[in-house]
């Protein structure tokens, strides 16, 4: 395969993998999760898809990795714009069959693929793994009514302060993504990838709270495969099942790795099985 790096006019850094052969290839754009960068977790999937005959693109959202933009600013609507910017660039590449563009998303990116597909008919196929359906339920679902009211009041006060003063609190990623799985993962990777050791606005919690990928999934008509991990404590499998139920497309499947945790899917036997299932889905529907 041929691997090249590019920087788009929007400031988005991407890596473009193309299989051997002078033909127009179908394309899979891989969309990362919460504060993810393209060199972490994604290459194994990108390489597997490219070896199977698909061109692939991995990229950094604006504000993360090698892309331009305010460091750590995570806004789902902006990240969806980034996906569409990548589609715009990709369809102009001579080696790409622009009638066969698919999206693959993981975790938060597994929600973004629905947001993008709902806005852009060029998306012909989706794989979404380890995603959530409703950010409000995800963030506040285990709170009682009093705890939820207090939590939302605190967020609203912080948002008002930002509006009035322009100042806001920035925290480490694991202050927001605070489950034990994520704490272990981010502690492990930030030594190898210092660009993962960033501060993000605490109000990112509010962005997550207001994000409901299921609403976009209800507008999507292209084939959809949803992958869940049965032991996922980041985005519990019930969220993935709710997302599956919301998908409007008549061509949809739900695949579960019952014994896997959130970060298990990227390596070992779990990865091998999931990548094979996803590759077959793209071969059939893209």
UniProtKB/Swiss-Prot annotation:
Keyword terms: Plasmid
Top-level taxon of origin: Bacteria
A Pfam family it matches: Abhydrolase_1
Ranges of residues in domain AB hydrolase-1: 26-268
InterPro entries in alphabetical order: AB_hydrolase_1 (IPR000073), AB_hydrolase_fold (IPR029058), Polyketide_trans_af380 (IPR051411)
Family according to the record: Belongs to the AB hydrolase superfamily.
Protein's UniProt name: Uncharacterized 31.7 kDa protein in traX-finO intergenic region
Origin organism lineage: Bacteria, Pseudomonadati, Pseudomonadota, Gammaproteobacteria, Enterobacterales
């Amino acid at each position: 395969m041929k691997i090249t790096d590019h920087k788009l006019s929007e400031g988005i850094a991407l890596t473009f993998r193309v299989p051997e052969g002078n033909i127009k290839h179908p394309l899979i754009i891989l969309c990362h999760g919460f504060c993810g960068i393209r060199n972490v977790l994604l290459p194994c999937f990108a390489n597997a898809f490219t070896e199977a005959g698909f061109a692939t693109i991995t990229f950094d959202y604006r504000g993360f990795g090698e892309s331009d933009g305010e460091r750590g600013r995570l806004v789902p609507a902006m990240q969806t714009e980034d996906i569409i910017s990548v589609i715009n660039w990709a369809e102009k590449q001579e080696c790409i069959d622009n009638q066969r563009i698919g999206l693959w998303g993981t975790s938060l990116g597994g929600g973004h693929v629905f947001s993008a597909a709902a806005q852009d008919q060029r998306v012909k196929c989706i794989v979404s793994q380890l995603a959530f359906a409703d950010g409000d339920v995800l963030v506040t679902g285990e709170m009682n009514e009093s705890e939820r009211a207090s939590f939302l009041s605190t967020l609203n006060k912080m948002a008002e302060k930002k509006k009035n003063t322009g100042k806001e609190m920035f925290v480490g990623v694991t202050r927001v993504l605070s489950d034990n799985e994520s704490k272990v993962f981010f502690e492990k990777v930030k030594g190898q990838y210092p660009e993962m050791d960033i501060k993000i606005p605490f109000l990112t919690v509010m962005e997550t709270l207001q994000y409901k990928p299921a609403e976009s999934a209800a507008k999507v008509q292209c084939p959809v495969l949803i992958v869940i991990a049965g032991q996922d404590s980041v985005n519990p499998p019930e969220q993935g099942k709710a997302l599956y139920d919301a998908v409007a497309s008549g061509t949809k499947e739900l695949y579960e790795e019952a014994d896997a945790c959130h970060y298990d899917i990227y390596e070992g036997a779990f990865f091998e099985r999931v990548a094979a299932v996803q590759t077959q889905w793209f071969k059939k529907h893209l």
